[in-house]
Amino acid sequence: MMLHIPGVLTKEQVAQCRDILDAADWADGNATSGAQSALAKRNRQLPEGSPAARAIGDAIQDALARNALFFSAALPLKVFPPLFNRYAGGDAFGTHVDNAIRLLRGTDFRVRSDLSATLFLEEPDAYDGGELCVEDTYGVHRAKLPAGDMVLYPASSLHHVTPVTRGERVASFFWIQSMVRDDADRTLLFQLDTQIQQLTAEKGGRDASVIALTGIYHNLLRRWADA
């Protein structure tokens, strides 16, 4: 499942993030690449653990903690500290799959990458190219979203970023370890939760069908979740 999550950051928050990012020192994006990714990747990246990355990453994680749609879809157990990249002048990232395990350098913190997230920090009309293209059995799905919006997709997916031929594409990217490892199970829970919320809005939280379906949701979560 590929999901668009609008308004993770407000426009004011995006502007504040960009002020910090535009003043920061950027490095070769291959500093965090695995062997396969290094063959396909050409971009710039904010060094892991830099003061700018930590400050903006904390703001993003605070915003995610308040985002009900993100929680419902991801059921997050761990979130890898957000990283940041920029593409310009023909930069691109060829087709690849993300590493299964992400280790935070200098620590014992590690995340199983069940989900990948890209949070856009530049408006789509400010650059040409730079589309995130995610492949699945139904074809290729493209994302080039407004600044502050995020796309969430299975980390097991083949994906690439098309060349940026005008302007620059700036984004945050990170990985989530979900309480529910299996993508199909997680998607089913998300669909069920969405319907429960809609039914609650129509009939109220005391309706018998709402109570019954909520019980089913939690029993499925209890069966599938690692916490």
Curated annotation (Swiss-Prot):
* Pfam family for this entry, one: PKHD_C
SUPFAM superfamilies associated with the record? Clavaminate synthase-like
Give the Enzyme Commission number.
Answer: 1.14.11.-
Where is the signal peptide, in residue numbers?
none
InterPro entries reported in the protein's UniProt record: Oxoglu/Fe-dep_dioxygenase_dom, PKHD_C, PKHD_hydroxylase, Pro_4_hyd_alph, Pro_4_hyd_alph_FE2OG_OXY
**Source species, please?**
Burkholderia thailandensis (strain ATCC 700388 / DSM 13276 / CCUG 48851 / CIP 106301 / E264)
Q: Where does Fe cation bind?
A: 96, 98, 159
Highest taxon above the source species: Bacteria
UniProt keyword terms in alphabetical order: Dioxygenase, Iron, Metal-binding, Oxidoreductase, Vitamin C
Q: Which cofactor does it need?
A: Fe(2+); L-ascorbate
Q: Which residues bind 2-oxoglutarate?
A: 169
Q: What is the protein named?
A: PKHD-type hydroxylase BTH_II1201
Q: Which NCBIfam families match?
A: PRK05467.1-2, PRK05467.1-3, PRK05467.1-4
